[in-house]
């Protein structure tokens, strides 16, 4: 499990007690409704959440990190109407922000009389309201959808639903505090979002959404800024120190770690407000959604919960003996949205043909003064087991007070959200190990195989699982190790997107999703390997320490092609292996797209050397041809590409060597690209006797030889005049500092040319370029020609280690004085971009830029 927090009595769920908060020990009346966990799970020990204790029984749905989990279906039902906090489902997009009660602020802006920042103490001084409320992810039961056809979301079982007592200030009271303007004055929507930079997309990387001002001000709707759950201040996984609570709506609208409120005349423009939590028509796929504007259509936004119900007893893989008739109590839950009351739950024993069995509804909640019901009901139905003997499918459905009920048939949608089809149990007559006749129950799509090793009937029906293979005794196929889990090639090929990207290395499969934001080469470096065997490319560019680091992302073995894998040995329990049988005809090759760019992030492309031009004694221009004379390279400004070559090393073994390069040719150049490369020869520099490995490989090429090229990669993109993206977060820029060392000039030169060749781009540039000697300065005539033709916008300053007499620029290591003379100081709209040897960046660039107001990784960006 891990190590108990050293000061657990002063902490709750890894956070310090809020001033005045009682310790959560067994003397505390809230202890049973929290069932607190004080130990760090081993699975969290090496990630950013290594301070948050979590219940070990929660089922992790997206690997170790980020933490997305649900309790086992039957377990959460046994807890009763109120869910212990430690067993509450969790939906996190990334690491949990480590926020503090005393320092956290909520910024309130927009159409209010008194824009301000308010503290948590300010909120706690407002009248406190406690609302019992069900939260559920709108992806609840999504695994059933994914078994029909993969959606864009990961699989939830039926356990993404929990009830807590939430305490906080009414949003209406907070809005009155700041003097919210009236609808007549234009105030129509209240926007709310979490911390900036939490997520990869959108203008500021925040998760945000909105509701109407009328809804926010309506006291009957119980909209809160919540800071307590089940009597104690919030668990970090659930939004500490505060979150939105919108009862009767999907959980995705109750934004956690609330940081900003904004009153507007328009609906939220947050990226996630448009691209998440929608139920698009079933014919809409990812391509048509993007091209035809479906994401921006407000008709499909999912706000209120729809009606839903499930069966928890009988459970998955549960058996009932058929030797005699007994009484058995069926159980489950039901809920609806918008405050609507559940009025009945029905059970059918013939697949939904007749509904003659109304269940007993167990109502624990007291509705609010407006008659709103914000939680769930549990239901029970005592039956004779003889009713199971003749049944093949048992179905439940719920009805609410508006006479809504559940659809009989599941509808596939792109995001897989809002699945509320009737919950169906399949029944199987079997003989147990003792030779007794029994009924085995099979739920549609549980997250984990049952105690007998069986998967859900939707998995089985899809033809992707072995129907009845007890995990303890299922024999592995030849070539498989029964103690390990496996991923088939077909499964691997499905994980190529940012939401879930896997790759194989030396026969093992790794989940790179959680490392996308932290990879030094940017997310593209991992995404281009997604769904593939990346062994050659990985070995070509990574050190032994990087290979060691890879171990924490291991998930399974790569199954040998053509070997069937039993369900109990598959990672996730789903066998999506595709076996190509002998004699199967190959699919016809697609026609060549003459307008397609040369670069392909998923495929190595051969480029032939057309010319070698010596620029100086140790600098060469290499011109490589594309597939045809009119073809564009397809490299966005600011990005680079990987070039590799298979060579025979000194030991006589074949190896792949690969490096990242930026061409000096403009994006609009057709038919070829140029690389200007400094050749680091062996036995020239005493500190580097072997010289530059790849530059010497390039120098040895003859005209007509080829290299392999793949890309683009990189986290920086100069998108259009005055705009750039850093890790896909778009920002405006007016002034760019560039610091380059040696061959690190080439990406700077690429960006400079793109800016200065566009008459509408007025961005100013300062370049500080460091080299060993004046003779080492690459592209000096071209640089100074750019500066001469744009004297008001381009300034260039050099520094060299060994200056010659009469040298008019700087000498030595880059220092603060040099930076202040050559570069812009930080102000909004100014960034610094860097490319050069790591020691230069670490010890010279970043420390001095920080003193000038730049923030590493945000406004001081390494290429």
From Swiss-Prot:
The domain of life for this entry's organism is: Eukaryota
Q: What is the effect of changing residue 659 to A?
A: Loss of enzyme activity to 13% of that of the wild-type and decreased affinity for NADH
What is a single molecular function from GO for this protein?
heme binding
Task: Report any one BP term from Gene Ontology.
Answer: nitrate assimilation
The record, for InterPro entries, names: Cbr1-like_FAD-bd_dom (IPR008333), Cyt_B5-like_heme/steroid-bd (IPR001199), Cyt_B5-like_heme/steroid_sf (IPR036400), Cyt_B5_heme-BS (IPR018506), FAD-bd_FR_type (IPR017927), Flavoprot_Pyr_Nucl_cyt_Rdtase (IPR001709), FNR_nucleotide-bd (IPR039261), Ig_E-set (IPR014756)
Give a yes or no for keyword Iron in this entry.
yes
Alphabetized CDD domains for the sequence: cyt_b5_reduct_like (cd06183)
Protein name listed in UniProt: Nitrate reductase [NADH]
């Amino acid at each position: 499990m891990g190590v108990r927090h050293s000061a657990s009595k002063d902490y709750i769920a890894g956070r310090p007690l809020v001033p005045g908060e009682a310790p959560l020990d067994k003397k505390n009346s809230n202890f049973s409704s929290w069932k607190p966990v004080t130990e760090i799970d081993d699975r969290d020990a090496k990630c950013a959440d290594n301070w948050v204790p979590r219940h070990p029984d929660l089922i992790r749905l997206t690997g170790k990190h980020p933490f997305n989990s649900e309790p086992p279906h039957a377990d959460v039902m046994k807890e009763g109407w109120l869910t212990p906090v430690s067993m509450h489902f969790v939906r996190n997009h990334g690491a949990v922000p480590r926020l503090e009660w005393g320092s956290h602020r909520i910024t309130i802006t927009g159409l209010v009389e008194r824009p301000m920042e308010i503290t948590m103490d300010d909120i706690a001084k407002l009248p406190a309201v406690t609302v019992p409320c069900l939260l559920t992810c709108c992806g609840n039961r999504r695994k059933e959808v994914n078994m029909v056809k993969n959606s864009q979301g990961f699989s939830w079982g039926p356990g993404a639903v929990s009830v807590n007592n939430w305490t906080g200030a009414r949003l209406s009271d907070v809005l009155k505090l700041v003097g919210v303007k009236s609808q007549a004055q234009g105030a129509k929507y209240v926007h709310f979002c979490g911390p900036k930079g939490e997520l990869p997309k959108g203008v500021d990387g925040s998760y945000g959404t909105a509701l109407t001002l009328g809804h926010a001000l309506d006291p009957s709707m119980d909209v809160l800024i919540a800071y307590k759950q089940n009597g104690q201040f919030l668990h970090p996984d659930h939004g500490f120190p505060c979150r939105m609570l919108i009862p009767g709506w999907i959980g995705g609208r109750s934004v956690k770690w609330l940081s900003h409120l904004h009153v507007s005349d328009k609906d939220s423009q947050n990226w996630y407000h448009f691209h998440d939590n929608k139920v698009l028509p079933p014919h809409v796929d990812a391509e048509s959604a993007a091209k035809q504007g479906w994401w921006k259509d407000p008709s499909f936004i999912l706000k209120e919960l729809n009606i839903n119900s499930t069966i928890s007893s009988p459970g998955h893989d549960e058996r009932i003996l058929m030797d005699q008739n007994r009484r058995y109590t069926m159980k489950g839950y039901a809920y609806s949205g918008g405050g609507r009351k559940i009025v009945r739950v029905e059970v059918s024993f013939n697949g939904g043909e007749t509904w003659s069995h109304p269940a007993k509804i167990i109502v624990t909640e007291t509705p609010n003064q407006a008659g709103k019901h914000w939680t769930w009901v549990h239901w029970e139905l005592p039956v004779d087991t003889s009713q199971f003997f003749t049944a093949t499918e048992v179905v439940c459905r719920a009805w609410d007070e508006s006479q809504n009920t559940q659809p009989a048939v599941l509808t596939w949608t792109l995001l897989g959200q809002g699945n509320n089809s009737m919950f169906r149990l399949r029944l199987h007559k079997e003989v147990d190990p003792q030779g007794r006749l029994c009924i085995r129950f099979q739920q549609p799509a549980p997250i984990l195989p049952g105690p007998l090793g069986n998967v859900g009937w939707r998995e089985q029906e899809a033809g992707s699982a072995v129907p009845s293979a007890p995990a303890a005794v299922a024999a592995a196929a030849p070539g498989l190790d029964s103690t390990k889990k496996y991923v088939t090639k077909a499964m691997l090929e499905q994980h190529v997107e940012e939401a879930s990207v896997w790759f194989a290395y030396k026969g093992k499969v790794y989940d790179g999703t959680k490392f996308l934001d932290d990879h030094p080469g940017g997310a593209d470096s991992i995404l281009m390997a997604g769904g593939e065997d990346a062994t050659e490319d990985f070995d070509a560019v990574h050190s032994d320490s990087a290979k060691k680091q890879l171990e924490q992302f291991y998930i399974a073995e790569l199954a040998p092609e053509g070997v069937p894998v039993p369900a109990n040995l598959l990672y996730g329990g789903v066998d999506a292996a595709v076996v190509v049988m002998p004699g199967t005809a190959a699919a016809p090759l697609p026609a060549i797209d003459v307008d397609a760019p040369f670069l392909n992030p998923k495929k190595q492309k051969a480029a032939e050397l057309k010319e070698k031009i010596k620029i100086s004694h140790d600098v060469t221009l290499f011109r490589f041809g594309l597939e045809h004379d009119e073809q564009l390279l397809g490299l966005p400004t600011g990005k680079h590409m990987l070039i590799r070559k298979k060579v025979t090393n000194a030991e006589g073994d074949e190896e792949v060597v690969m490096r990242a390069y930026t061409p000096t040719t403009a994006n609009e150049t057709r038919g070829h690209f140029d690389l200007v490369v400094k050749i680091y020869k062996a036995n020239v520099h005493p500190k580097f006797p072997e010289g530059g490995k790849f530059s010497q490989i390039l120098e040895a090429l003859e005209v007509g030889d080829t290299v392999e090229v793949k890309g683009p990669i990189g986290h920086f993109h100069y998108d259009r005049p005055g705009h750039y993206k850093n890790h896909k977060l778009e920002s405006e820029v007016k002034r760019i500092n560039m610091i380059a060392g040696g061959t690190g000039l080439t990406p700077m030169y690429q960006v400079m040319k793109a800016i200065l060749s566009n008459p509408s781009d007025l961005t100013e540039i300062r370049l500080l370029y460091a080299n060993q000697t004046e003779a080492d300065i690459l592209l000096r005539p071209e640089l100074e020609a750019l500066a001469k033709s744009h004297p008001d916008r381009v300034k260039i300053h050099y520094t060299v280690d060994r200056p010659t007499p009469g040298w008019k620029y700087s000498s030595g290591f880059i220092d603060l004085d040099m930076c202040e003379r050559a570069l812009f100081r930080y102000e909004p709209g100014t960034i610094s971009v860097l490319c050069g040897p790591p020691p230069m960046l670490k010890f010279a660039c970043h420390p001095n830029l920080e003193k000038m107001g730049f923030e590493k990784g945000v406004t001081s960006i390494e290429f």
